[in-house]
């Protein structure tokens, strides 16, 4: 693998830009015609458990609700797009974004950025895909150009605003997306050929893209043809990788990148052969001889090779690695970096805190992804005795294993394990018809694990029971039931809470059936009701 050093030139950051750069946006502008948020009544059963000052969105296809703690800031309409705006590297979500239809706007859409009080911060005359990097608000083109590429990029499709000063920074006229790293700005530009008519599909789009790296004043520091720049936050398991690293994809022909390079905007170090991020500040890189290196990108200023493997690395916890093993009788390889032990793995699962490894010899281990500590080490059953199996890292040291006997996939054996071994072999609820077809982890709290259990209800509608770790149904007949996914774990619901719909209400519920916050399915601000169909 080639490692090169590239030193970026720097210019003193400009603290003040021309007012003309602010065309189309302003700090604390006059109220827009949208007149948001719409006043709504807070349900009387809103729980004090939500009074934590965190922004959350209760999604509904006909109008989503934005809350800060238990206070309702905004009730949306069906034509709106609502999203949280945050920096994954920070510990708070400070803003939310609303875009809506407006025929008076040249684009047919307007949008605005709001803070945690519901105050309007900035307004725009079109919709954008919005990200936050430190104090920089990045407005990218809403529609992913890669999936349309039938029109030219217009000036203003990609913008960068310093929220500290309210100043808009220079951006290339043909830029459609930007990645911010250490006060440097990597723009991806699309130079559409003039020979193509508007609406004509560009089959060679990636032959016409260009990466431009600029400082705050717009001075170009580096340019690369047939190259795109993206943030590692678009990859999986990026916890712990500094924002110093940006991903550069290079294209020679077609839509698949021919090479991928991680570039460090602070040190100038570049690492070729990027494969994927692996968690805990590491990533996998393919070398020129076909090997794969696990490289630590976070512990020191320069990268450090931790180990080399003959397969691509999928997951990493300190002292433990899981590699892909395509083409053999088993799917994965487990490597103990301390003892050198290697064993075939049938299935594996990870969340942001734990890594569950189910080996073909029947051993099941759960690792802490931060410390590498073994939370659970038990024997389940050899894969040779099963037709197939699934494993989940449930949380709080739990691991869930579903074993499917040969010839009968209708009733798998469901086992829950913790550090002491088997907690319970879960039985199908007696109240559930034989139409059972879905079982998955739901939430954990206070040392207890809960699962959602789907089955066919009346008129073919799917209903859900909530089961505890002992297999007891603590809630029955929910119309919807699933985990809440918010802003990268920054605004998780209070422990144990999840998304649910029961009767004519939908919202956030606890395992004892209490609503933390709920809304009536008839509370939509439009004439058409989504009846709580959450998206």
Q: What is the predicted function of each stretch?
A:
Residues 7, 31-32:
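Intrinsically disordered, low-complexity regions enriched in serine, threonine, proline
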Residues 14-16, 169:
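N-terminal processing/targeting junctions
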Residues 27:
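Short, conserved catalytic or interaction motifs in soluble domains
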Residues 33-535:
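Residue-level detector of conserved, function-critical positions
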């Amino acid at each position: 693998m080639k490692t090169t050093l590239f030193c970026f030139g720097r210019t003193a950051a400009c603290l003040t830009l021309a007012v003309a750069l602010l065309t189309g946006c302003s700090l604390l502008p006059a109220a827009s015609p949208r007149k948001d948020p719409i006043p709504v009544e807070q349900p009387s059963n809103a729980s004090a458990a939500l009074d934590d000052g965190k922004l959350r969105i209760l999604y509904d296809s006909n109008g989503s609700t934005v809350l800060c703690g238990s206070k309702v800031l905004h009730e949306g309409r069906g034509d709106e797009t609502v999203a949280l705006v945050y920096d994954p590297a920070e510990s708070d979500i400070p803003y939310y974004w609303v875009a809506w239809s407006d025929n008076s706007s040249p684009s047919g859409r307007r949008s605005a950025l709001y803070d945690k009080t519901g105050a309007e911060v900035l307004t725009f005359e079109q919709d954008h895909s919005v990200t936050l990097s430190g104090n920089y608000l990045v407005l990218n083109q809403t529609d992913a150009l890669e999936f349309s590429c039938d029109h030219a990029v217009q000036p203003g499709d990609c913008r960068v605003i310093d929220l500290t000063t309210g100043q808009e920074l220079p951006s290339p006229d043909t830029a459609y997306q930007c990645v911010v790293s250490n006060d440097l700005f990597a723009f991806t530009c699309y130079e559409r050929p003039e020979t193509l008519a508007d609406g004509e599909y560009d089959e060679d789009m990636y032959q016409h893209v260009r990466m431009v790296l600029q400082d705050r004043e717009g001075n170009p520091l580096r340019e690369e043809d047939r190259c795109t720049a993206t943030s590692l936050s678009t990859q999986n398991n990026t916890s712990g990788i500094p924002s110093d690293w940006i991903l550069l994809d290079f294209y020679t022909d077609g839509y698949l990148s021919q090479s991928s390079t991680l570039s460090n905007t602070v040190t100038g170090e570049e690492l070729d052969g990027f494969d994927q991020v692996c968690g805990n500040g590491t990533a996998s890189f393919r070398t020129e001889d076909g090997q794969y290196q696990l490289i630590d990108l976070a512990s020191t200023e320069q990268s450090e090779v931790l180990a080399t493997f003959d397969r691509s690395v999928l997951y990493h916890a300190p002292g433990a690695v899981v590699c892909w093993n395509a083409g053999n009788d088993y799917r994965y390889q487990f490597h103990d970096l301390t003892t050198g032990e290697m064993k075939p793995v049938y299935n594996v699962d990870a969340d942001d805190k734990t890594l569950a490894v189910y080996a073909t010899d029947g051993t099941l281990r759960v690792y802490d992804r931060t410390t590498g500590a073994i939370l659970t080490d038990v024997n389940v059953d050899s894969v040779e005795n099963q037709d197939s199996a699934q494993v989940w890292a449930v949380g709080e040291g739990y691991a869930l294993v579903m074993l499917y006997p040969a010839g009968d996939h209708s009733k798998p054996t469901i086992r829950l394990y913790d550090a002491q071994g088997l907690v319970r072999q879960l039985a199908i609820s007696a109240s559930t018809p034989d139409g059972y077809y879905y079982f998955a982890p739901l939430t954990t709290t206070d040392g207890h694990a809960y699962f959602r259990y789907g089955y066919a209800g009346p008129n073919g509608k799917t209903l859900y029971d909530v089961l505890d770790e002992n297999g007891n149904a603590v809630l029955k007949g929910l119309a919807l039931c699933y985990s809440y996914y918010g802003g990268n774990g920054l605004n998780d619901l209070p422990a144990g809470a999840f998304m649910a719909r029961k009767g004519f209400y939908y919202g956030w519920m606890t395992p004892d059936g209490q609503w933390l916050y709920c809304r009536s399915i008839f509370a939509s601000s439009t004439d058409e009701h989504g009846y709580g169909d959450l998206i």
